[in-house]
């Protein structure tokens, strides 16, 4: 039986966190926090209920997020990887400070169409451009927080601030939110057969001014939901 098929309680969780505002929101709420130096990372060993959580701040971007995900799995034996933080809004059905759990991720900058005629975002190993997260953990979160909506996330190495980019992601992929780490995280988790839960709070309508105004509030909201969810796992 591989880790994706386990129904036992998760005891070791890895957390991939991109920026300081997100990390600070979480560190305030754990039962305990200890600094752990491992390799190139200044990690944090944290406690919530009977779970041991290892958190690292990656910095923005897919490559940094993928490297940190692999580090958490290899160094600490993470049985579940959680990415929690803030995102940009692409949907009329969402508003700033809403929280979503990511159902699918599309890596919108991955494009091999010139040589294989595949759709933009399509990796050979996945059936669709939409890479699914693990339903069992989404459902556990939403059973406790039914107001949290599911969303499709467009992920790439770009802060989306232009109207044209926003319209493209909606038109081409049906994306509802966007950010810069989830593709690297979910693909790394799939490679390792480790489940992944991605939870985001909307900090902006793809506008840098909204982001600076709401990032701390959004991070506080998502951290509350994720901490309580981890305690239930």
Regions found by a protein language model. Give the residues of each.
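Short, Lys/Arg-enriched N-terminal segments with co-localized hydrophobic residues
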Residues: 1-9
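Regulatory input/activation interfaces that engage signals or partners
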Residues: 194-196, 201-233
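N-terminal short beta-loop-beta anion/metal-coordinating cradle
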Residues: 10-70
């Amino acid at each position: 039986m591989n880790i994706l098929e386990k129904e036992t309680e998760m005891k070791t969780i890895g957390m991939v966190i991109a920026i300081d505002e997100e990390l600070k929101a979480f560190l305030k709420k754990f039962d305990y926090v200890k600094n752990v130096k491992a390799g190139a990372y200044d990690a944090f060993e944290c406690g919530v209920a009977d779970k041991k959580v290892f958190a690292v701040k990656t910095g923005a971007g897919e490559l940094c997020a993928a490297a940190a995900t692999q580090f958490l799995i290899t160094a600490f034996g993470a049985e579940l990887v959680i990415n929690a933080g803030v995102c940009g809004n692409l949907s009329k059905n969402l508003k700033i400070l809403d929280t979503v759990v990511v159902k699918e991720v599309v890596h919108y900058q991955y494009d091999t169409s010139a040589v294989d005629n595949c759709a933009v975002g399509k990796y050979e190993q996945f059936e669709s451009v939409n890479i699914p997260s693990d339903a069992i953990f989404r459902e556990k979160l939403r059973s406790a927080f039914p107001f949290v909506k599911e969303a499709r996330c467009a992920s790439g190495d770009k802060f989306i601030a232009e109207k044209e980019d926003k319209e493209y992601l909606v038109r081409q992929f049906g994306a509802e939110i966007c950010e810069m780490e989830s593709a690297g995280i979910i693909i790394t988790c799939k490679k390792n057969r480790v489940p992944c839960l991605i939870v985001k709070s909307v900090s902006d309508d793809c506008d840098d001014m909204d982001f600076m105004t709401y990032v701390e509030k959004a991070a506080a909201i998502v951290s509350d939901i994720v901490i309580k969810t981890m305690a239930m796992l």
